[in-house]
Amino acid sequence: ARRLGALDLDDASRVESIKTRSRRVLALYVAITLVAWAVLAVAFGDAEAGLLYALAAVATGGFAPSGDSLAGISGLAAALVLGICLVSAVSYDQWLRTRRSGWRGLVADPELRLLVGLCLGAGLLIALLQWWSGAGAGVGDAFAHAISAQTTAGFSTVATDAFSAPGQVVLIVMMLVGGDVGSTAGGFKLVRLLVLVAVLRVIWLRIAAGPRAVLPLERSGARIEQGELENAVALAVVMATALLAAWLVFLAHGVAPLAALFETASALGTAGLSAGVVGADLAPALTAVLTGLMWLGRVELFAVLILVLPKTWRR
């Protein structure tokens, strides 16, 4: 009985902790949205447009009042919208921890550093690829789409075909990686990418040092737990399998290989960028495939397993 009582107490404490965290995250989400609305209302000179762009940016949803997305607004307003997307692609738990650790703790966060580094590095790479190929999109477009793809926001300043084929491949990778765990961004998530990089690093070092070498599996100085590793590997396998299957379906319907890969990666990463294939006239089968990818990309593997495995329903 004592043991059962302890379990009940632990469960109650855990539930209360989840409730407290949820309230804090909700309050932070509302606060970020209100600040974003105020900033964008001034930038646009229109409170309604500011609100619509703020809601889409904080949610990294990418919906815009204008059919031109960010193409029809000023450079300053577009930069502010993308900046808000970056803020929302960072874990909300990290923003909450900043109250205790200060800005130094935020700057030291490895996921934040990786997010900013990927946006800057990919933007520069795409710009160089544009210059090399002579394609239509400029430097500003390269960085704007890099941020939009990495945060899975889906805002655009030019059509996707304005980028060279290698540039589109870079955007595909970014959409699949996505933002931070605990943020509004989709994708595989940065922390899981760091886990896989740590695994590859250990494998490489073990080859160099010999099979008897004892090499700890660590991420940012902290040991990677078995469950964390299994989570990352399992999700990577599921995402790769789903992406390949969906891509083959698109190819069977006559869609060009790169465009098919772009559309399926965008759906799986819940990014919303398009290569021009998706529209009102899209075949119902392809619409269903993209819908399934977006659902899988948003709820992720373990929520799907809970849904499809009856044994988990009673737990």
What are these regions (language model features)?
Residues 1-315:
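Membrane-proximal intracellular helices of multi-pass ion channels
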